[in-house]
From Swiss-Prot:
The lineage of its organism: Bacteria, Pseudomonadati, Pseudomonadota, Alphaproteobacteria, Maricaulales. Residues 192-201 have a biased composition (Basic and acidic residues). This is Glycerol-3-phosphate acyltransferase. It comes from Maricaulis maris (strain MCS10) (Caulobacter maris). It catalyses: an acyl phosphate + sn-glycerol 3-phosphate = a 1-acyl-sn-glycero-3-phosphate + phosphate. Its EC number is 2.3.1.275.
């Protein structure tokens, strides 16, 4: 199989696996209706939490991270490191822009973490540690997510993995674009804090994040 065919296979497989909308599937199975009709309309764990089911939100978080990690691991094992990187990146794209749901999905933080943990675990651990540290200091979930994503390409470069740094950098750009409403509220000082109450303005935005969980 040529390099181009390997890349195409990894991209297609990663995208299709990443596009499985676990948040939507789980909430429908639980009789909670269409998760896209509440909150931000996203399919990630953050919005699932708005149903009041912390167990489903936690399971969604694990599955969303896991699907990207599994895609990267499977293609990386059978087709090589580059294929693993491509599969992980496209699993991220599939989660954020699933074809089955009109290309409206989650914000990609969980799938980003899952991908990083598999393609190069030191970077994945750096992302998790950065999120935890920023969340503990500033108590703002979206800020922690943005800082964690930004840390990834620099960590990859520090560890001598420019290939991972390039992929992480591209995904970080997408994460920032998907969090543009959050960034706007951060600049205005209106982003809610973890454990705090939302104002009416920030509570009803179309793509906001719950302050009690990482944006996913």
């Amino acid at each position: 199989m040529t390099s181009l065919l390997i890349a195409l296979a990894a991209a297609a497989g990663g995208y299709l696996f990443g596009s499985i909308p676990f948040g939507l599937v789980l909430t429908r199975m639980a009789g909670l209706g269409d998760i896209r009709a509440i909150g931000s309309g996203n399919i990630g764990a953050t919005n699932v939490l708005r149903t009041g089911r912390k167990d489903l939100a936690a399971l969604t978080l694990i599955l969303d991270a896991g699907k990207a990690g599994i895609a990267a691991a499977v293609f990386g094992y059978f087709l090589g490191t580059t294929a693993g990187l491509v599969a992980g990146a496209f699993a991220f794209a599939g989660h954020c822009f699933p074809v089955w749901l009109g290309f409206k999905g989650g914000k990609g933080v969980a799938t980003f973490v899952g991908t990083m943990l598999v393609v190069f675990w030191p970077v994945g651990l750096t992302v998790i540690a950065t999120w935890l540290a920023m969340a503990a200091i500033f108590r703002i979930s979206s800020l922690a997510a943005l800082a964690a994503a930004l840390a990834a390409p620099f960590a990859a470069l520090a560890w001598g993995r420019p290939d991972v740094a390039i992929m992480a950098g591209l995904l970080t750009v997408l994460i920032y674009w998907l969090h543009r409403a959050n960034i706007s509220r951060l600049l205005k000082g209106e982003e809610p804090r973890i454990g705090g109450k939302k104002s009416e303005t920030s509570a009803d935005v179309s793509d906001g994040d719950d302050p009690d969980t990482p944006a996913t």
